[in-house]
Structures are given as structure tokens and as C-alpha cells.
A protein has these predicted regions:
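Cleavable N-terminal signal peptides
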Residues: 16, 25-27
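A metal-dependent hydrolase metal-coordination microenvironment
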Residues: 199-372, 378-379, 385-396, 427-432, ...
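Substrate-binding surface in catalytic domains of secreted glycosidases
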Residues: 385-446
């Protein structure tokens, strides 16, 4: 969840107006009454949202259309427990009258400017999409949602007839929503046409462990309908999505409705799995601190949900909006319910604090991650998601962050933002949380079992709420530091498909995502925003890591040092993400991690290893003790634009039993 304060502003404004209403007209002089009327008029437009969005990259050549999603929300939210949801009683909103939507397109870059002629999708000579019926605007009482299926051939034809120098691989769209008595609502999107497939390795499937659909629906955050989500995810190169809609926005009926929608959309092209993002009370201070957790269903029955012990028909965990009147469920109670259902969980953005307006905080290493006594990970907790949001840059202009139109202030467009840099946040999260947990998991066992005490896995998720082209946010931290961002919002270059968890599933994802869930539960995954690096021990020396006796990420191997087979590496990148610049091997012990070891990357194989590449670990591990250790790897690439991309593997645990 992205921290925000929209509902706080909404509630504050409503309280002011409510006080004015309570006082009555006679309590004000004429000038004062005029001010009240102005405030009432402004509030009448509060909660009206316009959105236009499209996939950042079109990677599926089988889809001949470019989907542009348009949404208008006239101040109505679905039933939820969010703070301020009852404020609408104070607000009178007139219906909106939609005339239509104009779409303009041009090649990307400042050399080209939009023409005055829209891209026409039908016989209309005025709108790309004409909403009028019999010449009358379409009346919107509460919500309007439509996906404009723009033929790719129409885009190519338009560009060829209006611009020289094609064909063009990157194009800019200007989407103008026209509503009576409102200024034109303009959105600017950048799209890669015919983008190449993402790097792939057989039996590994890309997905997102943290994505919000339209079932996340509150005054602060909303996702997109599942059919829109599915189409965009396929274009982005995803194989599966774990839907993690907020526990504050769900009800038993809505959770069942979401599952019904998921089932209808299962056709073998993209696997949708219904999960949940649960707001919980931290063990540090249940009255003050809330944290978030990604809840995943049982791999044995992905559609089961999380049945309540007293009422098995209620399969959704409903808890916590940050308000004192609706306290969050204790973290341990939620984990108990999830594990009782056969599910598991990941700590969501554990070290990115949630907005203090929502009483949000960070996960505590000792109280939240570890079970009482500090000897084990909390039951049901598989790991953590410190790689949350693929953000490198932010922009003040949340409708044109790419500076597509002529811009008066280029500083309002995407600029590198160290405070939100994904690698800085990820490495800090690894240092604060993952490393200490991995280290504690290497402590000696007291039961005589020859295995690590416990394992903790890493996952990556976009945390996108719709956000197909870029992410639009409102952040209380930026509000306190920069008023314009608090009032007008800002943009991040995060989007669906920009970051993924890649799961190992040799039997495929499964008819309901069973194998995706097993891989997530067992740490058979890597995190990536482009390249893929996998590692393992080929125990039968047949040149494959896909046999049952082979050992891969998330697993362990115990053998004498002299019998330890080479670690086999395999990687793949592409021109889009650039050749491998480095592979770092990191060894972790019960006293901490050793300095990274640079693994040589043959220049001829910088884009792809083209099979397994062996690495002898015996020299690296020769001084190790006969206790459990782990190894993990980080690969980095750099493309022609000097952008860096990475892949982080989960560990392999190793015990050397002798010389």
C-alpha cells in the first residue's frame, strides 16, 4: 500500500463544511455566507477522479489492440471500513455529463508535437470515443469505466500519415476527457510498441506477488477491473498475479465476487490468484502501530481463502483502517488464521513506513518477524518483500511525468529520487531485516535435525494499484516536506510489469496457480526487474537443474567438501536491459555475511549464458566450519541508456561435513 492522506483531507474538509451546515445560514453575514457557498461548491467536486492509463510496453504480438483504460469516479466508493467513508453524507455531487474522449498520438521525443487531429476509432469526426447519445452527453451518476481498444494498425497508419521517419518503437499518447462544465482532463502516456519479450528461462514464470485490482477501492486508492488488469499484465509479460486487495476494502460478498471474476478469467494465458493485503497491529504497540502483510492461500486449495474458525463461510480477513474506532487484528492472530487455512504470508514493504495518518509503522525484527523466544520465524511467515515498487524517479506532474507536452518546468517531470530509489530501499531492507533473519536461521538446532533452524525468503512486488504506465501517489511525507505534492500528488516510474518475482514451476503454474504458490512458500524464486539469474547443484551431472535430485534456490545440500559439486549458474538478459556487468556471490554465516565474491562473466556470454556455467565453491568454502551457511547471488546489467537492472536469488543452504 502506498501511504497517502487523501481521505484525511476529505474528512477535514467535510468537517469544516459540516460545521457550517450545522450553524445554519442565519449565523453568517452575507460575505461569510458567500464564502461558505464557495466552500460547498469546491467540496461538491471533492472526490471526483479522472484517470486514463495504458500498458507501458506491448510485449504480446498476439493482441492487435492497444488498450487505453478511461475511468471517471463521481465521488462514490464501495462499501469499506476506511476512515472517512461516511463523509459522503455531507457532500452533494451533481451528475457529470461526459461528451467524449479524444486520443492524440505522436512519436516520442521533443522533436515531434501532437497534431490537432485526433486518432479516430469510428466514424466520428469529433471524438476518438463519442459518449453522446442522440447528441446528448452521457450522464454519469457515480462511475464510468471503459477500455478503448485502439487497433495497433490504426496507430501505425496515423503515424505514417502525419510524421516522417518511421517506423516508431516508442509513442506518446495524449488522452483528453471532455466533461460539460469541467476543464478538459488531459493525461499523457508513453508506450513501447512491439516491445520484445522479457528474458526467459524454461520452467521459470514471471509474476507479481503484490498487485491491487479494482477490489481495492477507497477514497485514497483504487485499482482497475480484473479484465483490464489481465489484458495489461499479459502485455507487460507477466505469467501470473497474486491479487492483494486491502483487507479494509473487502467484505465476504466482495471477496466471493472477486473469486468468481478470477475463475471466469482463467484461460491459460495469465494466472490470477486471489490473496489479500492485510492491515495488522504490530506487536510493538498494537494501539499505535499498524503494518501490512501479503496473505497467500493454500497451494493445495488456492480458492479456499482464509476461513474464519467460527464461521467457515467467511473466507476473508477484514481488519484495520488505521482508525481508533476500527482497530487492526493482531499480527499473530492473522497468521494463525492463515496457517489454519494452509496458507502463508510475506511481510509487505516491511521497512517502508506506512503513513502516520494511518498509524503506520515498520515491522519489528524481534516482535513481528520472530515467534516468542526469538528462536523461530513466526509460523506461517515465509519471508519478506523489501523489493517493493520499481521506483527510481518521481515527478511533481502526475498527469505528464514524462514531459511529453511542452513543459514550463522540466523539474516537475521524472527526476531521480534517492529517497525512493528501489535499490537503496532494497539494500537497506536486506541489511535491516533479511540478513539478520538469515543469520538467526543458522543457529544450532536443539532437536538434532540436520537442517537449518529456519529459512527466510525474499520476494519482489510492484504494489501497483492499476498503474499500467506509471504510478500516481499522494504521500504524507511529501506533503510535510513539499506542499504541492501533498495537495496535488506526484508520480513514480513504478508500474505493473516493471518488477517481478520469478518462480520455479517445472510442471507449469498449475490450473489454479498451485505451483506458483508452492514456489513462493518454499523460496524457489528470484526477484528481478529485467535479467534472470538462477543457480543450483546438478547432482546427477546431466547438464540440467530440473531433476528431482538437483538442489536449487530455497533448498539445502549437505555433503563433504571434496564431494561438493560445482555450483551451476544460468543467466539471461536482453538488449533492453543490457549485458551482465557483474555477478556477486555472497556467503552468509551465523556471524554475518562475508564480503561479496565477484564471479567472472565471459564477455561472449554477457547477454545469455547459453546453458549452465560451473563455479567451484570449494576454494571459497574451504575455511568454513561444519555448520550451516548459505549462499545467495546478485546479478546486475546496464543497458545503452546507462540504466541498471538487477536480479536477486534466494539462498541455497550448504553444510560442509568434512574435508
Amino acid at each position: 500500500m502506498r501511504p497517502n492522506v487523501w481521505h484525511f483531507y476529505f474528512l477535514l474538509a467535510a468537517m469544516i463544511v459540516a460545521a457550517c451546515f450545522t450553524a445554519g445560514p442565519s449565523a453568517f453575514s452575507r460575505p461569510q455566507q458567500g464564502l461558505v457557498d464557495q466552500l460547498k461548491e469546491k467540496l461538491s467536486k471533492t472526490g471526483v477522479f479522472f484517470r486514463a492509463d495504458a500498458p507501458r510496453s506491448l510485449r504480446n504480438p498476439g493482441d492487435v489492440h492497444l488498450p487505453i483504460f478511461v475511468e471517471i469516479i463521481n465521488g462514490v466508493e464501495q462499501e469499506a471500513h476506511t476512515t472517512g467513508s461516511g463523509v459522503s453524507n455531507f457532500v452533494k455531487r451533481d451528475p457529470l455529463k461526459l461528451q467524449g474522449v479524444n486520443i492524440f498520438v505522436k512519436p516520442s521525443g521533443i522533436r515531434h508535437q501532437f497534431t490537432t487531429e485526433p486518432l479516430l476509432l469510428d466514424t466520428s469526426q469529433e471524438f476518438s470515443f463519442d459518449a453522446r447519445v442522440g447528441g446528448q452527453p452521457l450522464v454519469i451518476q457515480d462511475r464510468f469505466k471503459k477500455t478503448l481498444e485502439v487497433p495497433r494498425e490504426a496507430v501505425r497508419s496515423y503515424l505514417a500519415s502525419h510524421f516522417l521517419g518511421g517506423p516508431f518503437t516508442s509513442v506518446d499518447f495524449w488522452v483528453s476527457i471532455r466533461v460539460v462544465d469541467w476543464p478538459e482532463q488531459d493525461f499523457y502516456l508513453r508506450v513501447k510498441l512491439n516491445a520484445p519479450p522479457l528474458p526467459q528461462i524454461p520452467n521459470w514464470y514471471r509474476g507479481d506477488i503484490h498487485y491491487h485490482s479494482g477490489y481495492t477501492d477507497n477514497p485514497a486508492e483504487r485499482g482497475y477491473p480484473l479484465d483490464v488488469t489481465k489484458q495489461a499484465a499479459i502485455q507487460a509479460g507477466m505469467d501470473w498475479l497474486l491479487l492483494t486487495d486491502h483487507s479494509t476494502d473487502l467484505s465476504p460478498d466482495r471477496y466471493k465476487e472477486e473469486l468468481d471474476d478470477v475463475k471466469k478469467l482463467r484461460d491459460g494465458r495469465l494466472m490470477l490468484i486471489r490473496g489479500e493485503e492485510v492491515t495488522l497491529a504490530s506487536g510493538t504497540d498494537a494501539a499505535v502501530i499498524t503494518v501490512h502483510m501479503v496473505a497467500a492461500p493454500s497451494p493445495d486449495d488456492p480458492d479456499k481463502g482464509f476461513p474464519e474458525l467460527q464461521n467457515a463461510d467467511n473466507t476473508v480477513i477484514i481488519t484495520g483502517d488505521g482508525s481508533v474506532s476500527y482497530p487492526a487484528m493482531p499480527l499473530k492472530d492473522a497468521l494463525a488464521r492463515i496457517t489454519a487455512a494452509g496458507g502463508f504470508a510475506y511481510a509487505a514493504h516491511p521497512f517502508d513506513p506506512i503513513s502516520p495518518v494511518m498509524r503506520g509503522g515498520k515491522w519489528d525484527l524481534d516482535v513481528d518477524f520472530l515467534a516468542p523466544g526469538g528462536k523461530q520465524l513466526q509460523a506461517g511467515l515465509a519471508g519478506l518483500e523489501p523489493w517493493n515498487r520499481a521506483t527510481m524517479s518521481t515527478a511533481d506532474d502526475m498527469r505528464d511525468p514524462f514531459c511529453i507536452r511542452p513543459h514550463e518546468d522540466a523539474s516537475a517531470c521524472f527526476q531521480h529520487d534517492p529517497s525512493l530509489d528501489q535499490y537503496i530501499r532494497l539494500e537497506q531492507g536486506i541489511k535491516e531485516g533479511w540478513q539478520p533473519l538469515l543469520q538467526r536461521g543458522l543457529a544450532p538446532r536443539s532437536d538434532g535435525t540436520d537442517a537449518p533452524l529456519f529459512k527466510t525468503f525474499l520476494a519482489a512486488g510492484s504494489d501497483a494499484h492499476g498503474d499500467l504506465n506509471f504510478e500516481a501517489s499522494m504521500d504524507v511525507t511529501d506533503f510535510l516536506g513539499k506542499l504541492s505534492r501533498g495537495l496535488n500528488g506526484y508520480a513514480e516510474d513504478n508500474a505493473l510489469g516493471r518488477i517481478s518475482t520469478v518462480v520455479y514451476a517445472p510442471a507449469g503454474v498449475g490450473p489454479r496457480g498451485e505451483n506458483v504458490l508452492r514456489a513462493l512458500r518454499e523460496g524457489r524464486t528470484v526477484g528481478s526487474n529485467g535479467p534472470i539469474l538462477i543457480a543450483g547443484f546438478d547432482r546427477n551431472s546431466n547438464g540440467s537443474l530440473d531433476d528431482p535430485e538437483d538442489v536449487g534456490v530455497g533448498q539445502e545440500i549437505s555433503c563433504p567438501l571434496k564431494s561438493l559439486p560445482p555450483l551451476q549458474l544460468r543467466w539471461v538478459s536482453s538488449e533492453e536491459f543490457g549485458p551482465l556487468q557483474s555477478i556477486k556471490l555472497i556467503v552468509g554465516t551465523s556471524t554475518g555475511e562475508l564480503p561479496p565474491v565477484e564471479v567472472p562473466v565471459p564477455s561472449a556470454k554477457a547477454l545469455a549464458s547459453e546453458g549452465l556455467v560451473p563455479l567451484d565453491l570449494r576454494q571459497i568454502l574451504k575455511e568454513g566450519s561444519q555448520n550451516w551457511i548459505y549462499i545467495r547471488l546478485v546479478a546486475s546489467t546496464r543497458n545503452s541508456a546507462n540504466d541498471e537492472f538487477r536480479c536477486y536469488t534466494n539462498p541455497i543452504w550448504i553444510k560442509v561435513t568434512g574435508e
